[in-house]
Protein backbone atom coordinates (compact mmCIF):
# COMPACT_ATOMS: atom_id res chain seq x y z
CA UNK A 1 0.00 0.00 0.00
CA UNK A 2 1.36 3.41 -0.91
CA UNK A 3 0.71 6.09 1.66
CA UNK A 4 -1.00 9.40 1.01
CA UNK A 5 2.39 10.99 1.51
CA UNK A 6 3.68 9.51 -1.74
CA UNK A 7 6.41 11.83 -3.00
CA UNK A 8 5.20 14.34 -5.55
CA UNK A 9 1.52 13.50 -5.10
CA UNK A 10 -0.92 16.35 -5.60
CA UNK A 11 -4.64 16.56 -4.94
CA UNK A 12 -6.87 16.99 -7.97
CA UNK A 13 -10.41 16.46 -9.22
CA UNK A 14 -9.32 13.01 -10.39
CA UNK A 15 -10.77 9.96 -8.67
CA UNK A 16 -9.29 6.47 -8.40
CA UNK A 17 -12.00 3.89 -9.21
CA UNK A 18 -10.13 1.28 -7.17
CA UNK A 19 -9.64 2.99 -3.81
CA UNK A 20 -11.35 6.39 -4.10
CA UNK A 21 -8.11 8.32 -3.74
CA UNK A 22 -7.71 11.79 -5.26
CA UNK A 23 -3.95 12.29 -5.04
CA UNK A 24 -1.80 11.25 -7.99
CA UNK A 25 1.93 11.43 -8.60
CA UNK A 26 4.22 11.46 -11.61
CA UNK A 27 5.71 8.10 -12.56
CA UNK A 28 8.33 7.56 -15.27
CA UNK A 29 7.59 10.95 -16.76
CA UNK A 30 3.82 10.45 -16.80
CA UNK A 31 1.97 13.11 -14.76
CA UNK A 32 -0.87 11.97 -12.46
CA UNK A 33 0.04 8.36 -13.18
CA UNK A 34 0.35 6.69 -9.78
CA UNK A 35 -2.44 6.79 -7.20
CA UNK A 36 -0.87 7.84 -3.90
CA UNK A 37 -3.32 5.72 -1.90
CA UNK A 38 -3.28 2.32 -3.65
CA UNK A 39 -0.38 2.65 -6.09
CA UNK A 40 -2.51 1.88 -9.15
CA UNK A 41 -1.32 3.03 -12.56
CA UNK A 42 -3.44 4.04 -15.56
CA UNK A 43 -3.93 0.51 -16.87
CA UNK A 44 -5.10 -0.78 -13.48
CA UNK A 45 -7.69 1.98 -13.18
CA UNK A 46 -8.96 1.41 -16.73
CA UNK A 47 -9.26 -2.31 -16.02
CA UNK A 48 -11.21 -1.58 -12.83
CA UNK A 49 -13.64 0.68 -14.69
CA UNK A 50 -14.31 -2.06 -17.25
CA UNK A 51 -14.69 -4.82 -14.67
CA UNK A 52 -17.17 -2.79 -12.62
CA UNK A 53 -19.23 -1.89 -15.69
CA UNK A 54 -22.45 -3.61 -16.67
CA UNK A 55 -20.71 -5.00 -19.76
CA UNK A 56 -18.98 -7.77 -17.79
CA UNK A 57 -21.25 -10.60 -16.54
CA UNK A 58 -20.90 -11.13 -12.78
CA UNK A 59 -23.03 -14.26 -12.24
CA UNK A 60 -21.43 -16.68 -14.67
CA UNK A 61 -20.99 -19.35 -11.98
CA UNK A 62 -17.60 -20.63 -13.19
CA UNK A 63 -13.99 -19.85 -12.24
CA UNK A 64 -12.68 -16.44 -13.28
CA UNK A 65 -8.90 -16.63 -13.69
CA UNK A 66 -6.67 -13.62 -13.05
CA UNK A 67 -3.11 -14.16 -14.30
CA UNK A 68 -0.10 -12.39 -12.77
CA UNK A 69 -2.53 -10.93 -10.22
CA UNK A 70 -2.04 -7.34 -9.14
CA UNK A 71 -3.22 -6.50 -5.59
CA UNK A 72 -5.41 -3.61 -6.74
CA UNK A 73 -7.25 -5.57 -9.45
CA UNK A 74 -7.33 -8.72 -7.32
CA UNK A 75 -9.33 -6.84 -4.70
CA UNK A 76 -11.83 -5.65 -7.31
CA UNK A 77 -12.23 -9.16 -8.73
CA UNK A 78 -12.69 -10.75 -5.31
CA UNK A 79 -15.40 -8.19 -4.56
CA UNK A 80 -17.17 -8.85 -7.88
CA UNK A 81 -16.80 -12.62 -8.24
CA UNK A 82 -16.35 -13.91 -4.69
CA UNK A 83 -15.59 -17.64 -4.52
CA UNK A 84 -15.32 -17.85 -8.32
CA UNK A 85 -12.26 -15.59 -8.32
CA UNK A 86 -9.06 -17.55 -8.94
CA UNK A 87 -5.65 -15.83 -9.11
CA UNK A 88 -3.01 -17.80 -11.03
CA UNK A 89 0.63 -17.59 -12.08
CA UNK A 90 3.50 -19.76 -13.22
CA UNK A 91 5.30 -18.98 -9.92
CA UNK A 92 2.57 -18.70 -7.25
CA UNK A 93 5.04 -18.43 -4.35
CA UNK A 94 5.73 -14.80 -5.32
CA UNK A 95 2.22 -13.78 -4.21
CA UNK A 96 2.42 -14.18 -0.44
CA UNK A 97 0.17 -11.12 -0.07
CA UNK A 98 -2.82 -12.81 -1.73
CA UNK A 99 -5.67 -13.80 0.59
CA UNK A 100 -6.81 -16.30 -2.07
CA UNK A 101 -4.40 -19.18 -2.82
CA UNK A 102 -2.71 -18.58 -6.17
CA UNK A 103 -2.99 -21.56 -8.52
CA UNK A 104 0.03 -22.60 -10.56
CA UNK A 105 -0.79 -22.37 -14.27
CA UNK A 106 1.54 -22.65 -17.27
CA UNK A 107 -0.05 -20.72 -20.14
CA UNK A 108 2.15 -22.22 -22.84
CA UNK A 109 -0.50 -24.91 -23.45
CA UNK A 110 -3.79 -23.72 -21.94
CA UNK A 111 -5.81 -26.77 -22.96
CA UNK A 112 -3.43 -28.96 -20.96
CA UNK A 113 -4.68 -27.04 -17.92
CA UNK A 114 -8.30 -26.18 -18.70
CA UNK A 115 -11.05 -28.35 -20.10
CA UNK A 116 -12.85 -26.80 -23.08
CA UNK A 117 -15.84 -24.76 -21.93
CA UNK A 118 -14.87 -24.89 -18.25
CA UNK A 119 -13.86 -21.29 -17.51
CA UNK A 120 -16.06 -18.26 -16.88
CA UNK A 121 -13.46 -15.61 -17.59
CA UNK A 122 -9.80 -14.80 -18.16
CA UNK A 123 -8.26 -11.50 -17.06
CA UNK A 124 -4.63 -10.53 -17.55
CA UNK A 125 -2.61 -7.37 -17.97
CA UNK A 126 0.81 -7.28 -19.63
CA UNK A 127 1.17 -11.07 -19.57
CA UNK A 128 1.09 -12.22 -23.22
CA UNK A 129 4.46 -10.66 -24.02
CA UNK A 130 6.13 -13.00 -21.49
CA UNK A 131 4.88 -16.40 -22.68
CA UNK A 132 7.52 -18.48 -24.56
CA UNK A 133 5.02 -20.16 -26.87
CA UNK A 134 3.03 -19.42 -30.00
CA UNK A 135 0.80 -16.47 -29.16
CA UNK A 136 -1.74 -17.73 -31.69
CA UNK A 137 -2.08 -21.06 -29.91
CA UNK A 138 -2.13 -19.52 -26.43
CA UNK A 139 -4.96 -17.10 -27.19
CA UNK A 140 -7.04 -19.53 -29.22
CA UNK A 141 -6.70 -22.27 -26.59
CA UNK A 142 -7.70 -19.85 -23.85
CA UNK A 143 -10.77 -18.88 -25.84
CA UNK A 144 -11.58 -22.57 -26.38
CA UNK A 145 -11.46 -23.07 -22.60
CA UNK A 146 -14.15 -20.42 -22.08
CA UNK A 147 -17.72 -21.51 -21.49
CA UNK A 148 -20.44 -19.97 -23.69
CA UNK A 149 -21.02 -16.47 -22.35
CA UNK A 150 -17.53 -16.37 -20.83
CA UNK A 151 -15.22 -13.40 -21.26
CA UNK A 152 -11.57 -12.68 -22.04
CA UNK A 153 -10.29 -9.27 -20.94
CA UNK A 154 -6.66 -8.25 -21.38
CA UNK A 155 -4.06 -5.54 -21.84
CA UNK A 156 -0.63 -5.68 -23.47
CA UNK A 157 2.14 -3.10 -23.90
CA UNK A 158 1.89 -1.58 -27.37
CA UNK A 159 4.84 0.12 -29.03
CA UNK A 160 5.22 2.08 -32.24
CA UNK A 161 5.94 -0.16 -35.18
CA UNK A 162 5.22 -3.77 -36.02
CA UNK A 163 4.81 -7.04 -34.17
CA UNK A 164 7.97 -9.03 -33.68
CA UNK A 165 9.09 -11.91 -31.49
CA UNK A 166 12.08 -14.11 -30.74
CA UNK A 167 11.80 -17.00 -28.29
CA UNK A 168 15.44 -18.10 -28.57
CA UNK A 169 16.27 -19.33 -25.03
CA UNK A 170 19.95 -18.53 -25.56
CA UNK A 171 19.42 -14.84 -26.30
CA UNK A 172 21.40 -12.59 -23.96
CA UNK A 173 19.23 -10.69 -21.47
CA UNK A 174 20.67 -7.34 -22.53
CA UNK A 175 19.84 -8.09 -26.17
CA UNK A 176 16.32 -9.17 -25.24
CA UNK A 177 15.89 -5.93 -23.30
CA UNK A 178 17.12 -3.95 -26.29
CA UNK A 179 14.71 -5.68 -28.66
CA UNK A 180 11.66 -6.10 -26.45
CA UNK A 181 12.09 -3.50 -23.67
CA UNK A 182 12.45 -6.05 -20.85
CA UNK A 183 14.73 -9.03 -20.26
CA UNK A 184 11.89 -11.56 -19.98
CA UNK A 185 9.75 -10.37 -22.92
CA UNK A 186 9.42 -12.76 -25.87
CA UNK A 187 7.68 -10.31 -28.19
CA UNK A 188 6.70 -6.72 -28.93
CA UNK A 189 3.19 -5.72 -29.93
CA UNK A 190 3.16 -2.92 -32.50
CA UNK A 191 0.51 -0.31 -33.21
CA UNK A 192 0.97 -0.69 -36.98
CA UNK A 193 -0.41 -4.24 -37.21
CA UNK A 194 -2.15 -4.76 -33.88
CA UNK A 195 -5.56 -5.42 -35.42
CA UNK A 196 -4.22 -8.07 -37.80
CA UNK A 197 -1.69 -9.68 -35.47
CA UNK A 198 -3.63 -9.78 -32.20
CA UNK A 199 -7.30 -8.96 -32.53
CA UNK A 200 -7.82 -11.39 -35.40
CA UNK A 201 -7.01 -14.18 -32.94
CA UNK A 202 -10.45 -13.50 -31.47
CA UNK A 203 -12.43 -14.49 -34.55
CA UNK A 204 -15.66 -16.10 -33.35
CA UNK A 205 -15.69 -13.99 -30.18
CA UNK A 206 -17.77 -10.83 -29.68
CA UNK A 207 -15.79 -7.65 -29.07
CA UNK A 208 -17.37 -5.82 -26.14
CA UNK A 209 -17.91 -2.17 -27.08
CA UNK A 210 -16.59 -0.17 -24.13
CA UNK A 211 -17.64 3.16 -25.63
CA UNK A 212 -21.22 2.42 -24.60
CA UNK A 213 -20.41 2.88 -20.91
CA UNK A 214 -17.04 4.66 -20.85
CA UNK A 215 -16.06 7.92 -22.50
CA UNK A 216 -13.04 10.23 -22.53
CA UNK A 217 -14.39 12.34 -19.65
CA UNK A 218 -14.67 9.29 -17.40
CA UNK A 219 -11.14 8.30 -18.29
CA UNK A 220 -9.83 11.77 -17.52
CA UNK A 221 -11.53 11.72 -14.11
CA UNK A 222 -9.77 8.44 -13.37
CA UNK A 223 -6.42 9.93 -14.49
CA UNK A 224 -6.30 7.71 -17.59
CA UNK A 225 -5.17 9.20 -20.93
CA UNK A 226 -8.22 9.46 -23.25
CA UNK A 227 -6.07 7.91 -25.99
CA UNK A 228 -6.51 4.59 -24.17
CA UNK A 229 -10.01 4.31 -25.61
CA UNK A 230 -9.29 5.74 -29.07
CA UNK A 231 -5.96 4.09 -29.94
CA UNK A 232 -3.96 0.95 -29.22
CA UNK A 233 -1.89 1.71 -26.11
CA UNK A 234 -0.46 -0.14 -23.14
CA UNK A 235 -3.40 1.11 -21.05
CA UNK A 236 -6.11 0.03 -23.49
CA UNK A 237 -8.47 -2.71 -22.32
CA UNK A 238 -9.57 -5.32 -24.87
CA UNK A 239 -12.70 -7.21 -23.87
CA UNK A 240 -14.30 -10.15 -25.65
CA UNK A 241 -17.24 -12.41 -24.92
CA UNK A 242 -17.81 -15.95 -26.17
CA UNK A 243 -21.27 -16.18 -27.73
CA UNK A 244 -23.75 -18.04 -25.55
CA UNK A 245 -25.64 -21.03 -26.92
CA UNK A 246 -28.83 -19.02 -27.26
CA UNK A 247 -26.95 -16.50 -29.44
CA UNK A 248 -26.51 -19.25 -32.02
CA UNK A 249 -30.27 -19.74 -32.45
Placement of each model-derived feature along the sequence:
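Conserved N-terminal segment of class I S-adenosyl-L-methionine
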Residues: 1-117, 215, 230-236, 243-249
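Activation segment
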Residues: 94, 111, 131-132, 162
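A conserved beta-strand element that flanks and buttresses the S-adenosyl-L-methionine
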Residues: 123
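Short catalytic micro-motifs in class I SAM-dependent methyltransferases
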Residues: 126-130
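S-adenosyl-L-methionine-dependent methyltransferase catalytic module, highlighting the catalytic core
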Residues: 133-249
Amino acid sequence: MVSAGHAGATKSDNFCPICGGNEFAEYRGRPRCSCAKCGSKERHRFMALVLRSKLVPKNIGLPVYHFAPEPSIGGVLLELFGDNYQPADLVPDTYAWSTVPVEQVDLRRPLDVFEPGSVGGFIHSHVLEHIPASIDRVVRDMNAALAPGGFHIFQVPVHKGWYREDMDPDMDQSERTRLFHQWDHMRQFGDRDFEERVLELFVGMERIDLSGVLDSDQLRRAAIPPSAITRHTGHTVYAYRKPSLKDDH
